[in-house]
């Protein structure tokens, strides 16, 4: 992960020259198939907040070509994902993603969150979220709170036990930034979470 988005690089044998492969913007991706016995071909599955799971074919050149894509059951045109960084109460900087149609001004905004058990919240496509929320012209925010695994074990350990309150401070910093940037008013914001995220909200 590089700033919570997947980075995949090709390394040339012998020279060890590294070339980063071009993935969808703000994507989660992983290599799903590769075998030196089958040649230099490999396959990558990638998705983002606005792109459903896509199967990409790669080879030794480093180029990726789309082979197949899962259907999107809502209109993604006009939708964009941005990443912003905020500063929490103790000075720690953390990122969040916001997805929506930024031409519409302040809109109802749903903010998620988890911040626990070293679980990394990476970009992911959801038809349910798209149909029920994004297609209606609203914003969705995914914060990468401490307690998760986005930046390694220390990102998790910073907020355990007596420091647990810092997760709420992280979340508060994100909410304040959403308002400061004009994406939503306080009255337009709702927060949600499940499991550990339910304790957060």
Where are the regions that the model predicts?
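Predominantly soluble domains enriched in secretory-pathway, periplasmic, or organellar proteins
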Residues: 25-29
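Short, solvent-exposed loop/turn segments at conserved positions within beta-propeller repeat blades
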Residues: 1-6, 48-51
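Serine-hydrolase catalytic core recognition
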Residues: 30-201
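A short beta-strand motif characteristic of beta-propeller blades
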Residues: 17-23
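Short loop/turn segments that connect beta-strands within beta-propeller blades
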Residues: 12-16, 59-61
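Beta-strand-connecting loop/turn residues
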Residues: 4-6, 16, 40
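Short, solvent-exposed hinge/capping segments at secondary-structure junctions
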Residues: 8-10
């Amino acid at each position: 992960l590089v700033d919570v988005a997947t980075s995949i690089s090709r390394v040339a044998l012998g020279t060890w020259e590294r070339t980063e492969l071009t993935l969808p913007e703000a994507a989660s991706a992983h290599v799903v198939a590769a075998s030196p016995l089958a040649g230099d071909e490999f396959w990558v599955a990638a998705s983002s907040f606005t792109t459903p799971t896509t199967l990409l074919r790669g080879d030794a050149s480093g180029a990726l070509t789309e082979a197949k894509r899962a259907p999107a059951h809502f209109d993604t045109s006009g939708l964009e994902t941005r990443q912003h960084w905020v500063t929490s109460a103790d000075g720690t900087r953390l990122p969040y993603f916001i997805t929506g149609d930024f031409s519409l001004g302040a809109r109802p905004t749903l903010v998620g969150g988890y911040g626990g058990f070293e679980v990394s919240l990476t970009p992911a496509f959801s038809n349910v979220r798209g149909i029920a929320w994004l297609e209606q012209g609203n914003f969705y925010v995914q914060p990468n709170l401490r307690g998760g695994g986005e930046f390694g074990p220390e990102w998790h350990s910073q907020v355990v036990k007596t420091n647990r309150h810092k997760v709420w401070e992280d979340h508060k910093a994100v909410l304040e930034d959403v308002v400061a940037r004009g994406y939503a008013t306080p009255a337009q914001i709702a927060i949600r979470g499940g499991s550990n995220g339910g304790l957060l909200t």
